[in-house]
Each structure stands twice: as structure tokens, then as C-alpha cells.
């Protein structure tokens, strides 16, 4: 995800020098590619608690790794199919022919990138479950570096070599995904618990793959719900005027950047919960997740504080429009509160992942974000962006309550071990 995000940002910047139709074709494809990759990554997070449960047992761990690869193949192919269908989606949606004519092979390159990224996510999810976050970071940084270097070179060209334009962007992002996946799989093969063991997918164990999907697919559905509702919010902001639309878009980007810290902390709690889960130690499970919530809160507050202090130079990187900057500055306190609540709900959501019970998260998202989607347009029409972000804050606050309540109740079912409950 880090490599694809960095690649998308760089490609957007460099394609701005090309024809407007080219940038529009890029945006159209990314509108499908981004939720597709995020959904696949969400589905593969279901692998994490299963690998964490066997972090010291190679004989039990190896089949889980292979099952994760089969889940990656299945979800990756579905995501790739969606991205490859961008020309048909655009045609059915009434996208101008000029934009569609610029697509060329780009959707097919990005479809391949979805499948490659899925295989990489299978490895990184396994590494997270094993508590090897440094290897995950190394894989992400390798892909990011490749995207940052290759994107401008392949799109605009280097020296006497002509750029490839939009196909160059696709090649760069596919290469970055391949490098990230290769580094992740290399790191996985070097883990002591899997040393000298064949890590190919082997023969699929359908029931075991379905068990992984039972945890991962509700997570994928929550990702789709979140993307869909954020799209509704973007439309609500765009109905005001272009300045408010830009301010909203940049504010969402800022929340996404800060939110990555909460995701990292939330994922890191899963291997910490695993030993308590094995022992059916309810208190230990809850303590580990609460510690993750406190850590995520601290990380988000730290990054948010830096953002608040450096708000002027940071915003100048996103826009030179004074009106848009003023609007973002006015929203900044709300933006930071939204990130804090989003971070807390995410950690409790990962707590549910750790105990392999993710359907409650899906229900919480469906209710809270469903209400937000219904209220977004009328609230924005009456109160502008402030009302919109207050509504988002309210939805996230309800999510915190819902996720925490579900986690507390579902973790209580793990078993009673004397004084180990609270």
C-alpha cells in the first residue's frame, strides 16, 4: 500500500505536465485500483492471527502461509479483473471518449499490479503475524523508493530518452509492487521458523482458505464501505464549490497520512495478543489491545502536533490557493479529532482481528458510516465543511464505542481462567 500510494502521488504530479485527458485517464483507473488494492489488503489481514498462533511451530505455520497465498491469488484475481474492466466501467459511466482513448494498456498494467501486490500482502501479513514489522517496513520502503525513482523517469523520460507517458506510470507502479513483494517474500523465507521450507502455494486446502477468508473478507467489506462513504463526502464537498472540494480533499489526505501510524500500531498488537489467546487469558488479551490503543493515541497525537506546528509549510506543499489553505486551517482542529477517533476505532478493530471475530466490525461500519452517508449531503448544504467534518467525527466516535464494546463482549467469550478476567 505504501508503494502504491507514493507511486500514485508522484504519477499525479508528473502526469500534470501531459495532456489533461491523460491525467483524467490516470484518475479514472486509480478510482478503481485504489479501493481494489485496499480491499485485497484488508482481506489478507485475516491471515495475521492465524500466523501469530503458530509463530513457534513451523509444521503448523507452513500450511497457514500456503493458505494465505491461495487467498491472495483468489482476491488478487478478483481485484485485477475489476481494474482490467476500467474501460468498460468508464464507457458505461459516460466518461468522455477522449479520456477512454488515453487508457491504452494502463488498466492492464495496473491489473497486474493488483495481483502482484496481493502476493506481497500475503507475505507482509504473515510477517506482521510473526512480529517481524521491520521486514514489512523494509519491503514498503523498497517499493516506495522504486516508485519515486521510476515514475518520473518512465513518464517524462531521462536525458535523450523519451518518456512513455501513462504506460510508463503503469510500468513504474507494477515494478514497485514487484520489488516490494520480492523483498517481503525474501524476508519471509529468511525467518528462522520457516528456514529451508518450501513456501510455494502447494495444493489448496479449500476449508482452511475459507477459514482465513471468514476473518479477512469482513475486513475487506469494511474497507469498501469506508471508501464508498468517503466518496459520498467528497461529492457533498464538491457541491459547495471548487475551493471547498480542494480543502476537503487535502484534509482527507492529511488524515490518511496520520492514520497510517494507527494502522501500524494496530497490526503490531496482533502477535502480542496471540499468546494470551492461546492461554484463553481474557485479561491479557484486553490489556494488550488497550496498550495498543494508548500507543496509537500517543503516535497520532505526536504526528498531529507536528502537523499543527508546521501547518503553514505543510499546506504549501498541497496547494497555493490561499482560500483553500484558510479553509483547511479552520478545519484543522476537527481534522485532528477525526484522526484520533479513527485511530482508536482501528486498534479495537484489530483487537477483533486478533481474536478472529471481524463480523462485528463490519456491522459497526455499516451502521455508523451508513448513517454518515445519508446525512452528508443535507448537512453540508446547511453547514458547509464544518458540518460535514463534525458528522464524520460523530460517526468515528460512534465507531470507537461500537468497536470497543464489541471487542469487550467478544473477548469475554474466549474463556475464564480464574482471576484472568475483568
Regions found by a protein language model. Name each.
Residues 12, 20-23, 133, 166, ...:
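Membrane-helix interface/capping residues of multi-pass secondary transporters
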Residues 126-153, 167-170, 283-296, 351-374, ...:
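Alpha-helical transmembrane segments of multi-pass membrane transporters/permeases
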Residues 25-76, 80, 120-129, 247-305, ...:
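Small-residue-rich hydrophobic transmembrane alpha-helices
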Residues 1-45, 49, 113-114, 210, ...:
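Transmembrane helix-bundle signature of multi-pass secondary active exporters and lipid flippases
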Residues 17-20, 54, 129-130, 160-163, ...:
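Helix-loop interface residues and adjacent transmembrane-helix termini in multi-pass membrane transporters
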Residues 26-29, 33, 106-109, 127, ...:
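Hydrophobic positions within alpha-helical transmembrane segments
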Amino acid at each position: 500500500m505504501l508503494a502504491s500510494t507514493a507511486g500514485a502521488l508522484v504519477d499525479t504530479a508528473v502526469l500534470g505536465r501531459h495532456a489533461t485527458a491523460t491525467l483524467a485517464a490516470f484518475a479514472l483507473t486509480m478510482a478503481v485500483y485504489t479501493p481494489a488494492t485496499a480491499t485485497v489488503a484488508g482481506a489478507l489481514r485475516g491471515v495475521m492471527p492465524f500466523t501469530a498462533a503458530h509463530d513457534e511451530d513451523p509444521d503448523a505455520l507452513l500450511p497457514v502461509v500456503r493458505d494465505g497465498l491461495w487467498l491472495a491469488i483468489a482476491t488478487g484475481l478478483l481485484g485485477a479483473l475489476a481494474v482490467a474492466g476500467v474501460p468498460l466501467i468508464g464507457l458505461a459511466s459516460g466518461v468522455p471518449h477522449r479520456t477512454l482513448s488515453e487508457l491504452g494498456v494502463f488498466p492492464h498494467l495496473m491489473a497486474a499490479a493488483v495481483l502482484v501486490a496481493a502476493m506481497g500482502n500475503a507475505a507482509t501479513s504473515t510477517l506482521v503475524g510473526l512480529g517481524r514489522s521491520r521486514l514489512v517496513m523494509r519491503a514498503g520502503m523498497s517499493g516506495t523508493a522504486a516508485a519515486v525513482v521510476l515514475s518520473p523517469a518512465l513518464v517524462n523520460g531521462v536525458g535523450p530518452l523519451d518518456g512513455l507517458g501513462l504506460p510508463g506510470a503503469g510500468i513504474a507502479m507494477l515494478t514497485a509492487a514487484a520489488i516490494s513483494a520480492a523483498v517481503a517474500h525474501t524476508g519471509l523465507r529468511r525467518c528462522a521458523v520457516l528456514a529451508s521450507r518450501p513456501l510455494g502455494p502447494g495444493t489448496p486446502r479449500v476449508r482452511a482458505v475459507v477459514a482465513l477468508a471468514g476473518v479477512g473478507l469482513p475486513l475487506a467489506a469494511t474497507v469498501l464501505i469506508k471508501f464508498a462513504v468517503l466518496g459520498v463526502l467528497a461529492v457533498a464537498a464538491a457541491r459547495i464549490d471548487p475551493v471547498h472540494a480542494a480543502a476537503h480533499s487535502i484534509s482527507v489526505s492529511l488524515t490518511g497520512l496520520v492514520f497510517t501510524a494507527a494502522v501500524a500500531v494496530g497490526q503490531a498488537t496482533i502477535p502480542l495478543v496471540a499468546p494470551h489467546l492461546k492461554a484463553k487469558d481474557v485479561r491479557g488479551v484486553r490489556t494488550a489491545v488497550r496498550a495498543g490503543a494508548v500507543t496509537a493515541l500517543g503516535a497520532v497525537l505526536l504526528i498531529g502536533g507536528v502537523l499543527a506546528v508546521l501547518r503553514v509549510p505543510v499546506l504549501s506543499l498541497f496547494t497555493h490557493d490561499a482560500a483553500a489553505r484558510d479553509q483547511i486551517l479552520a478545519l484543522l482542529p476537527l481534522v485532528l479529532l477525526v484522526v484520533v477517533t479513527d485511530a482508536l476505532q482501528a486498534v479495537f478493530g484489530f483487537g477483533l482481528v486478533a481474536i478472529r471475530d471481524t463480523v462485528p466490525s463490519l456491522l459497526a461500519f455499516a451502521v455508523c458510516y451508513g448513517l454518515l452517508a445519508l446525512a452528508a449531503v443535507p448537512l453540508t448544504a446547511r453547514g458547509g465543511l464544518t458540518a460535514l467534518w463534525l458528522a464524520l467525527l460523530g460517526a468515528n466516535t460512534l465507531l470507537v464505542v461500537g468497536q470497543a464494546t464489541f471487542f469487550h463482549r467478544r473477548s469475554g467469550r474466549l474463556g475464564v481462567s480464574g482471576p484472568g478476567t475483568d
